[in-house]
Curated annotation (Swiss-Prot):
Residues 330-343 have a biased composition (Basic and acidic residues). GO terms for molecular function: enzyme binding. This is Dual oxidase maturation factor 1. May be required for the maturation and the transport from the endoplasmic reticulum to the plasma membrane of functional DUOX1. It comes from Homo sapiens (Human). It comes from the Eukaryota. The gene is DUOXA1. Specifically expressed in thyroid gland. Also detected in esophagus.
Amino acid sequence: MATLGHTFPFYAGPKPTFPMDTTLASIIMIFLTALATFIVILPGIRGKTRLFWLLRVVTSLFIGAAILAVNFSSEWSVGQVSTNTSYKAFSSEWISADIGLQVGLGGVNITLTGTPVQQLNETINYNEEFTWRLGENYAEEYAKALEKGLPDPVLYLAEKFTPRSPCGLYRQYRLAGHYTSAMLWVAFLCWLLANVMLSMPVLVYGGYMLLATGIFQLLALLFFSMATSLTSPCPLHLGASVLHTHHGPAFWITLTTGLLCVLLGLAMAVAHRMQPHRLKAFFNQSVDEDPMLEWSPEEGGLLSPRYRSMADSPKSQDIPLSEASSTKAYCKEAHPKDPDCAL
């Protein structure tokens, strides 16, 4: 105790964990901040265009956030099982636990939670990630996990995804992750271009880019499904149970967002051909139905509404020279202060 300054020794407690993936949390916060910013300026928009504008903003932000979120999500293929299994190597102790497996585009996430959490005089609550993204070495991460002495269920599932595993899950999911991620990045770029074009008087091309956004998302799902079905399923035995995987939330969110983009793109293309003026009105753009109609300041015109087209006049605007001189003389005699006579 003297070496500690006559104080009790301090042992660090368990590290606090964030309730969700920090990358996904950052993406959600960015888009929520953008949505809050648009809502703040919403009262400055008058008329029915306010609701149309809010609908466009919410839909666009949802599509962009969904594309980015699923690209970094670890829930493309998920599975969970409750079983009794061995705990650690060189030990005959068994535990009752919930074991979860989440496979993403860039790696796997393995969870082990005891039921109850307190067993064998310790807290059984593990959440380990092993990645194979560009610049990462999955084999090295697995070797470090062996050195740390992680529980047997975590090491067993992680070993199934190593490059040398006979299951072939590493090549299968790594290939699927690379191609799927590439398609999603292209879809995100198409979404950016769609937003730019929809803010310009080229709405039909914005609809085409929105259609391309949905097509690339559906292609991403196709690549993921094809790559993950190249090899036969590898059984994952944990104690007396078998862990089975299935498509996770990220897969279904991508499918929903892709179909939504395709439907919106097709709807805009049809509306541009059938009802172009209503489409422009929905996007709060000028509706130039007839070039002979009067100009309005709200439609981007430079003239006041009191200036009308020559077509609105029942008579020709060309006045003969003799009539003009007589009219001028009448003005000087009867209404000398009339502003029209001053012209």
